[in-house]
Amino acid sequence: MEEKEFKSGFVALVGRPNVGKSTLMNYLVGQKVAITSNKPQTTRNRISGIYTSDRMQVIFVDTPGIFKPHSKLDDYMDKASLSSLNDVDLVLFMVEPEDMGKGDQYIADLLKEVKVPVFLVINKVDQIHPNKLLPIMDSYHKLDGFKEILPISATQGIGIDDLLNTIYKYLPAGPQYYDADQITDRPEYFVVAELIREQILRLTSQEVPHATAVVVDQMNKHQNGKLVIEATIYVERDGQKGIIIGKGGKMLKQIGIDSRKEIERLLGEKVNLRLWVKVQHNWRSDPSFLKQIGYDKKELG
């Protein structure tokens, strides 16, 4: 039997907010490396998930959802999405199983300038009857620019084998860039900060989640064997600080409990998590503060 050629490459996940890019990446790598929520703009930074098998290694670049910017942070997120298309081997343009709206069309127009193959990936097909999916797929087939059109469900695993087989077909032969057990290119403290932010997204509402940034100040082993993590939650106004802390500190305690469970699951060890809340007025439009907490445009090349 002929041995399969080993292939490797970088694949960008692109689409509107909340189409399931992070969910797909987490499914493919088998562990949570990108946070998810039902709120727009959950992903802020580029983060890569690494899928390795005996025939290929794929570095999936999960980008912030593309939308029209309203603040410096929004502008950073949009540039983070678009910059990831400059140096990848494939682009997966993710949409929901519905007719193409203005947001999708905006992205489709941007992708016409991309020089690498673009796959249209229709996610959440488990949420629609097959009879309704077929005409939607037909309408997408009439559009130019897509090398492949693939229906999947990132939560149920539907169509994932076909997706991986198709990616393999298009990838170039190449080396294994990362160890087989490495699942992300981001350091642990980055993923830990994101897991805390995920719980804030889940537990708070209105403007509070989007006015929040999390910075891990230190991660140190304690004498009792527990890992001690100290992190600061930044908000823009005193009122938001009060909401994060909650009556009698209840909300902050709940954020801490739920975050600790996710962090322990990720790291596989007991964690002592200590959280502080600070006000940094209008941080989303403050370039120097954005740089200080890791939203550095130098990263965008």
From Swiss-Prot:
Region G4, residue ranges: 123-126
Residue ranges of every copy of the Era-type G domain listed in the record: 7-173
InterPro entries referenced in this protein's UniProt entry, alphabetically: G_ERA_dom (IPR030388), GTP-bd (IPR006073), GTPase_Era-like (IPR005662), KH_dom-like_a/b (IPR015946), KH_dom_type_2 (IPR004044), KH_sf_prok-type (IPR009019), P-loop_NTPase (IPR027417), Small_GTP-bd (IPR005225)
Keyword set includes 4Fe-4S: no
Transmembrane segments: none
Location of region: G2: 41-45
Presence of keyword Coiled coil: no
Region listing for G5, in residue ranges: 152-154
Keywords, ordered alphabetically: Cell membrane, Cytoplasm, GTP-binding, Membrane, Nucleotide-binding, Ribosome biogenesis, RNA-binding, rRNA-binding
Region annotation (G3) ranges: 62-65
Residues in KH type-2 domain copies: 196-281
PANTHER family (alphabetical): GTPASE ERA (PTHR42698), GTPASE ERA, MITOCHONDRIAL (PTHR42698:SF1)
Subunit structure: Monomer.
NCBIfam families noted in UniProt: era, PRK00089.1, small_GTP
Protein name: GTPase Era
